């Protein structure tokens, strides 16, 4: 019996030891499995983070590429438009600025119609509204279109009589007129710093004009009128936007269509229609190519500004405009050989610097 009991105790002890060993092994296996799982999860997290970092880097590179592209597009369109119009008016010696403006408005109108027609099928143009033209809306928009028409006409007239290097100075008093009209029409006062910036621009205008080698009173007068209409348009457009549901692109449809009708009678009254048919350039394919491209540029400038603000910011748009003015002046000196006196150069720098200061000041005031 004792021997039998001893055997049973030994057997039970062995079983217990086996169970303990098995339990320990199971626990060790569980720990190892947990470690393997944790390491696997850690590797997955690291891989996920690496993938996310790569995606962010690609987005950043893509974003920088997009920003650089839209700014370059704005520079190209804006400077090309000025140069093309100068070529038409001076190099071709086509002395019919009203006809040039009228034809370019027609090209812009055709461009608008095409772009709005395909906007639904082209995601990049989804911001454009459907084409429409209602007489009731047109009558409300008419006063603003008249201002815009004056602005475009005097722009081209100014460019006909001044050098491209002086063009920025001749039209520089826009912010000064804006300050005056804002006070008279909107009863709104401008801050001290913004006013000082306007004075810097005015001083630059005076110095630049006095130092201009190829000075033209007509160019100065047309530049002043252009500046006045630009300032007036920026105020008047705010009052008419409700008529087009606050959509500036819809307003551009009406502006372009109505301006075509407004400019045509001016061509007749000015006398351009009496002699234009005798102009040999009307039978030149090169001339019409330049005219058409300039018309396309006139519409694309609005698109380029919109894209620049969309992908950057209003502040970047302001800085870009200032740099563009510098580049435009330099290119005018290089390609056209426009002579610049020291006084004229100081005036140009004051105008560009003052305009930049004013824009920056207004931007930060609006953010408050």
From Swiss-Prot:
GO terms for biological process: GDP-fucose import into Golgi lumen. Signal peptide: none annotated. InterPro entries: Sugar_P_trans_dom, TPT_transporter. Keywords: Golgi apparatus, Membrane, Sugar transport, Transmembrane, Transmembrane helix, Transport. It comes from Dictyostelium discoideum. Belongs to the TPT transporter family. SLC35C subfamily. This is GDP-fucose transporter 1. PANTHER family: SOLUTE CARRIER FAMILY 35. One of its GO terms (molecular function) is antiporter activity. It is found in: Golgi apparatus membrane. The chain crosses the membrane at residues 64-84, 98-118, 141-161, 166-186, 195-215, 217-237, 251-271, 287-307, 332-352. It comes from the Eukaryota. Antiporter specific for GDP-l-fucose and depending on the concomitant reverse transport of GMP. Involved in GDP-fucose import from the cytoplasm into the Golgi lumen.
């Amino acid at each position: 019996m004792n021997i039998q009991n001893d055997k049973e105790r030994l057997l039970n002890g062995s079983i217990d030891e086996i169970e303990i060993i098995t339990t320990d092994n199971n626990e060790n296996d569980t720990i190892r499995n947990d470690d393997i799982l944790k390491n696997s999860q850690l590797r997955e997290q690291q891989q996920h983070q690496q993938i996310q970092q790569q995606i962010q880097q690609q987005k950043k590179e893509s974003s920088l590429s997009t920003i650089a592209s839209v700014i370059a597009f704005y520079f190209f369109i804006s400077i090309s438009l000025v140069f093309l119009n100068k070529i038409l008016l001076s190099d071709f010696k086509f002395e019919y600025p009203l006809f040039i403006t009228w034809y370019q408005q027609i090209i812009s109108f055709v461009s608008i119609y095409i772009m709005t027609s395909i906007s639904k099928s082209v995601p990049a143009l989804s911001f454009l509204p459907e084409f429409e033209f209602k007489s009731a809306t047109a009558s409300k928009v008419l006063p603003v279109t008249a201002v815009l028409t004056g602005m475009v006409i005097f722009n081209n007239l100014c460019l006909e009589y001044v050098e491209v290097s002086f063009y920025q100075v001749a039209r520089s008093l826009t912010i000064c007129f804006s300050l005056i009209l804002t006070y008279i029409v909107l009863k709104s006062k401008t801050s001290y710093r913004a006013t000082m910036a306007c004075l810097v621009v005015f001083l630059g205008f005076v110095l630049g004009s006095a130092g201009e080698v190829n000075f033209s009173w007509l160019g100065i007068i047309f530049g002043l009128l252009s500046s006045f209409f630009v300032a007036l348009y920026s105020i008047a457009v705010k009052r008419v936007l409700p008529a087009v549901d606050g959509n500036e692109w819809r307003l551009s449809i009406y502006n372009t269509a109505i301006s075509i009708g407004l400019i045509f009678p001016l061509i007749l009254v000015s006398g351009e229609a009496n002699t234009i048919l005798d102009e040999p350039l009307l039978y030149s394919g090169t001339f019409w190519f330049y005219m058409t491209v300039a018309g396309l540029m006139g519409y694309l400038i609005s698109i380029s500004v919109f894209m620049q603000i969309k992908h950057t910011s209003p502040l970047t748009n302001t800085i870009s405009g200032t740099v563009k003015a510098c580049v435009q002046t330099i290119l005018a000196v290089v390609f056209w050989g426009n002579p610049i006196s020291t006084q004229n150069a100081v005036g140009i720098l004051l105008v560009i610097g003052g305009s930049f200061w004013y824009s920056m000041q207004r931007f930060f005031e609006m953010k408050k």
